[in-house]
């Protein structure tokens, strides 16, 4: 069955794998998902990811990160802009949880965080928030 919202699917797979205490999760490949994964690695929310190509289709294998107590590094991850209701913000994007969390945006500069968007003076579509 085709997925209507690939970003929501990406977020849900990561959230469910973290709650189930899985070490890795597999997600169908797309360039956007690869860019999102790279950003989450840079910000320390996931350990690493690899692109695996099979005969049928490529996918991303994401290595999840946990605290010393075994809790997922991602405490909350949720979609903001949805197919039925797109959410955009200008260059003066507010901080999420007073700067403790991040908004992930799709902008003309690519996939960036709210902090990077404020520094570069760009806005865009708020894809999701993470804490």
Swiss-Prot record:
Part of the 30S ribosomal subunit. Contacts proteins S5 and S12. One of its GO terms (cellular component) is ribonucleoprotein complex. One of the primary rRNA binding proteins, it binds directly to 16S rRNA central domain where it helps coordinate assembly of the platform of the 30S subunit. InterPro entries: Ribosomal_uS8, Ribosomal_uS8_CS, Ribosomal_uS8_sf. This is Small ribosomal subunit protein uS8. Keywords: Ribonucleoprotein, Ribosomal protein, RNA-binding, rRNA-binding. Belongs to the universal ribosomal protein uS8 family. It comes from Pelodictyon phaeoclathratiforme (strain DSM 5477 / BU-1). NCBIfam families: PRK00136.1. GO terms for molecular function: rRNA binding; structural constituent of ribosome. The keyword Signal does not apply. GO terms for biological process: translation. The keyword NAD does not apply.
């Amino acid at each position: 069955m085709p997925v209507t919202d690939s970003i929501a699917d990406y977020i849900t797979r990561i959230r469910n794998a973290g709650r189930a205490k899985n070490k890795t999760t597999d997600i169908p490949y797309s360039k956007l998902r690869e860019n999102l994964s790279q950003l989450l690695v840079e910000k320390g929310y996931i350990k690493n990811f690899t692109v695996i190509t099979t005969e049928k289709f490529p996918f991303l294998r994401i290595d999840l990160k946990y605290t010393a107590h075994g809790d997922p590094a991602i405490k909350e991850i949720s979609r903001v802009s949805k197919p039925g209701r797109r959410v955009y913000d200008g260059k003066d994007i507010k901080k999420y949880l007073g700067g403790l969390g991040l908004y992930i945006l799709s902008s003309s500069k690519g996939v960036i965080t709210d902090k990077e968007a404020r520094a570069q003076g760009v806005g865009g579509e708020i894809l999701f928030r993470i804490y």
